[in-house]
Regions:
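Conserved catalytic core of the tyrosine transesterase superfamily
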Residues: 1-226
Length: 226
């Protein structure tokens, strides 16, 4: 042990740096650009689903929820009839980790859901909104049905997916990309997508250099030197 000139003891510095002495730095795991489709392709897919899908009224409402609100497939399939507040124009969404959010219901999405309830949803005891087309009329067990419908739409329209295994998540990425390129602030994009961390939303900043400059934060150490 060492001593000061006055005889007081001092604590010796550790000889080596360990994981307990070095602060952790948060790293963004996914550095790739988000995969997306242009708005014209998204609208073409929605129109194909509405007209050509075997159960177009139902499928169109499901796809609109993903394309307009950025919902994930499990979130769409978890929606119950009572989650829709028609007077307030809001939708309760059950997200990851038991998260609950109330989102505004766009007019076209509300109209599509209303048409499904009125014209296409079979009579059933379940309160799940979207049900299978055969008895017993219950909710979906396999979320891959949405990706299969999307694959058929892309094949019919000769639209090439930006990644082979991206599936229906491309609708969510495409919504975020469209918002960023329209000048929407990144924190607002994160609010729409209901990201827990701002770091998750930052992958979309790489799409537009001008928008990236507007959200860049100065490094605190750099400010101190000025």
């Amino acid at each position: 042990r060492g001593h000061t000139a006055s005889g007081d003891e001092i604590t010796p510095a550790p000889r080596t740096l360990t994981s307990s002495t070095v602060p952790k730095v948060h790293r963004i795991q996914n550095n790739r650009l988000p995969r997306y489709l242009p708005p014209t392709d998204i609208e073409a897919i929605l129109e194909w689903v509405r007209r050509e899908s075997s159960y177009g009224v139902r499928d169109y409402a499901m796809f609109l929820l993903m394309a307009r609100l950025g919902l994930r497939v499990p979130e769409v399939m978890a929606i119950e009839i009572d989650d829709i507040d028609w007077r307030a124009g809001e939708l309760l969404v059950r997200g990851k980790g038991k998260r609950r959010d109330r989102l505004p219901l766009p007019e076209d999405v509300g109209a599509a859901i209303s048409a499904y309830l009125r014209d296409a949803r079979p009579s059933t005891v379940t309160r799940v909104l979207f049900v299978r087309s055969y008895a017993p009329y219950l909710g979906f067990k396999d979320s891959r049905i949405v990706s299969k419908i999307l694959a058929r739409a892309c094949a019919a329209l000769k639209i090439e997916m930006p990644a082979r295994y991206l599936g229906s998540h491309v609708l969510r990425h495409s919504l975020a990309t469209r918002m960023v390129r329209s000048g929407v602030a990144l924190h607002e994009v994160g609010d729409v997508l209901r990201h827990k961390s701002r770091a998750t939303t930052m992958i979309y900043a790489k799409l537009d250099i001008a928008n990236l400059r507007s959200v860049a934060q100065p490094w605190p150490a750099g400010e101190a030197k000025q």
